[in-house]
Amino acid sequence: DLDGHDANWNGSLESNELHTNLLEFMADTHPWIADTDGDGMWDGWEYQQGLDPNNPLDTLTDPDGDGLVNRLEYNNSRVGTGYSEVDGIRSTTPLLNDTDGDGLLDGEEIFVYFTDPTWNDTDMDGMPDGWEVQYGFNPRDPADARSDLDNDGHDYDRSQAVEPDEYYTNLQEYLNGTDPTNPDSDNDGIPDGWEVQYGLDPLDPLDAVLDMDGDGWDFNRNGEVAGNETFTSLEEYS
């Protein structure tokens, strides 16, 4: 009855997507009827996803609490909200509330943010949808990856302006684990962008008081540079 499920939505059923006659027997479903309980969800998908292919009532339940009932998990395009579809997969997992693991519930993606619940970076800008939402960005706009929301870039060429190539972009903030709304994530007095540019750790406040390149001076001529003789990273920045 060809009631397997095309899980990758590529238009064909691979061997691991078939709901074989043996599985029909094990699930007590009808081998000649694709949807034994007539609930609009094919037996193979229900069995694969841990639902009951003999219970028509589970079509309107939401076991994972993500805001999508099972019939909408089975085919997201039934929703009709105009959400973005990136990877062509229109089925979410009915027992997992965040199918793509981006930090947003499947229902939130479809009804609130109009993002793709099976692809964790809808605008493909390198920043996951959930992270963008967390910090107030638009998960459907790739341009915000290139901006510098908190202005923690630096005027390296001393032109009196921070040009785009001197930005510490939102994408860099994500990749380095820094806060794109706070120019100094570790509160050490040095902007995140400057720390990353010079190989410091923007999440470690202690590197502000270190003399990374050893360019302090032994003012008291005692054979070592110590204490207030160091030229710290914070002083280098200042």
Where would I find each of the regions flagged by the language model?
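Extracellular calcium-associated, cysteine-rich motifs in secreted modular proteins
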Residues: 1-238
